[in-house]
Amino acid sequence: SVAQHLLHRFKPRRFESSQQSDMIPIRHMKINFKAETLNPRFYLNSELASAYFSSLSIFLTYGEELVIDTARYHRKFLQDARLKQRVTALIGQEALHSKVHEELNEALKEADFPVQLFRSMAEFVFNYGFNRLPQPMKLSLMAAIEHFTAVLAEYMMQHEEIFFHSCDDQQRAIWMWHMLEESEHKDIAYDVFQDLSNHYGLRIAGFFPAFITILVLIMAAACFVPLYRRPKNLISFNYWRSVPEGWQLLFGLKKGVYGSSWKHIFAYLHPRFHPNDFDTTAHLEYYKTRLLDPKNGILAPYFVKEFTPALTQVAS
């Protein structure tokens, strides 16, 4: 019947163990950031767009801690051994992202970025907001945060001409490494949500706080950065003339990071959405070689080691 067809079409998918992605490694990177070599215009020579990524780096460490804590809490409830192993890998990758971004943030602080102010803002949002949420809502928020990083990762991989012509090799390295791994584990948090909850209303409830934080709050913070670092920008014709271009780089509908990704962003609201509906397999294989090749890879100078967590059986 029509009713049954519609019910099937809009009923959230269940977690399917057999359809999980491959297991993923945890990679250690060492990038020796120095304040004097950080380029505040590393992203296409745009001060505003670059400030967004610098601000995102500061807030990301708090988001990653939420993901780690939430994943660790829910891991013990999983009955699928492979999913449990993948959650362990997710925790490992996110812990290293947080560590290296914190090193970048310390260098940004020395370079007169308002790091301490933004840390205080992030601590307020997380300590008095997100971290006080009940665990089911945290699980939903974790899945939503991972969705937005997956959107950013796919954009980066689809626009090689942008991210491989950065004005700062070290900032390019951290973002390319981070986004490679975000794409690798983009479905893990969602699979955990599917397995333990799969409640559509709860999933949507987690989407909007993530949306507001990543696209509104962090962007508002980014607008403050160029004025804080260089107060004369307030009366600089050249700076204000560059602002629309910076805005277009982030939110332009044709090539903007988020503006051109709006279909991917809002696909999350479809009841039968799954992260792997957006297939990045070919991109991942290409970038693993492009970034990690021992001789010519972009990340080779920063690579330390990698390992894959062991698969352990879940007690019945």
Indicate residue ranges for each PLM-predicted region.
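Non-heme di-metal
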Residues: 6, 10, 17-316
